[in-house]
Amino acid sequence: MSGHSKWATTKHKKAVVDARRGKLFAKLVKTVEVAAKTGGGDPAGNPTLADAIAKAKSQSVPNDNIERAIKRGSGELAGGVSYESVTYEAYGPNGVAVLVECLTDNRNRAASDVRVAITRNGGTPADPGSVSYLFNRKGVVLIDKTPTLTEDDILLAVLDAGAEEVNDVGEAFEVVSEATDLHAVRVAAAEADLTVASADISWLPSVSVPLDAEPARKVLKLVEALEDLDDVQNVWFNADISDDVMELVSS
C-alpha cells in the first residue's frame, strides 16, 4: 500500500503551489525594495518603482508587504538588505541560449546555486557575452483583449509613448518598446482605458530554436530548476515551443 491518499496528494500539490506563491511574493517584494533604494520611495518620481508596485499588486502581493519593502528600500525602516543585480549565461539542452537574472545579497551563493542547477539539468555555464548577444533588452506590455479591440487601436494609443510594434499573442496583445520607454507605454495604455495585464523589462531573442516535445521537456525542467532558486528573478531562453508541443509536454 502506497499510503498516498487523494487528500494527501491534494495537500502536497497545495503545499507546492503555496511555496511557489511565497517565493514569487518574496521576489516581487525584493524588486520593489531595490527600486525604492535606487530611485527613492515616491512612485510618482520613480517609474521603475511604479512598475514594480504595479506588478506586485497584479500578483496579489499584500499592500503591507509592498509598503514595508518601499520603506526598507528608502531607508525609512531598518532591516534593508543590499542587493546586487547579476546576470548569468548558459547553454541549455539542444543548444538553447539561457539568461538568468538574479538579485542577490551574496554573489558567491547565487553563482554556485545557478551553476549547480544548470549542470544538473543538462546545461553548460557560458562566459559573459557568449549568449546575451542573441537577445535584445526590451519593454513588453501585455494588454487584455476585448471583442472589439484591434492592434491598430492599441498602436494609435501608445505610438507616441515609444511603442515599436504590437503583436497578437493569443489571449493578449503584446506591445514592444525600448526598455527605457516601458513606463511611458504602460501609462499611455492605461490612460487610453486599455487593461494592462503586465509590464516588464524582457530579453527577447533575436534567433529562436524550435523544439520537439522531448528537448522542450528538458529545457523547461532546467528553467523550472532555475526559477526555483531564491536569488533568481527571471529566466530568459530562446526556445521556440509551439502550442502543440507545449500541450504534449504538459500532458
Swiss-Prot record:
Record keyword Zinc present: no
Subcellular compartments: Cytoplasm
Q: Keyword set for this entry?
A: Cytoplasm, DNA-binding, Transcription, Transcription regulation
Presence of keyword Transferase: no
Highest taxon listed in the record's lineage: Bacteria
Q: Which GO terms describe its cellular component?
A: cytosol
Q: Which Pfam family would be a valid example here?
A: TACO1_YebC_N
Its GO biological process annotations read: regulation of DNA-templated transcription
GO molecular function terms listed in the Swiss-Prot or TrEMBL record: DNA binding
Q: Which NCBIfam families match?
A: PRK00110.1, PRK12378.1, YebC/PmpR family DNA-binding transcriptional regulator
UniProt family annotation: Belongs to the TACO1 family.
Provide the protein name: Probable transcriptional regulatory protein Franean1_5147
| Protein's organism | Parafrankia sp. (strain EAN1pec)
Q: Tell me the classification of the organism that encodes this protein.
A: Bacteria, Bacillati, Actinomycetota, Actinomycetes, Frankiales
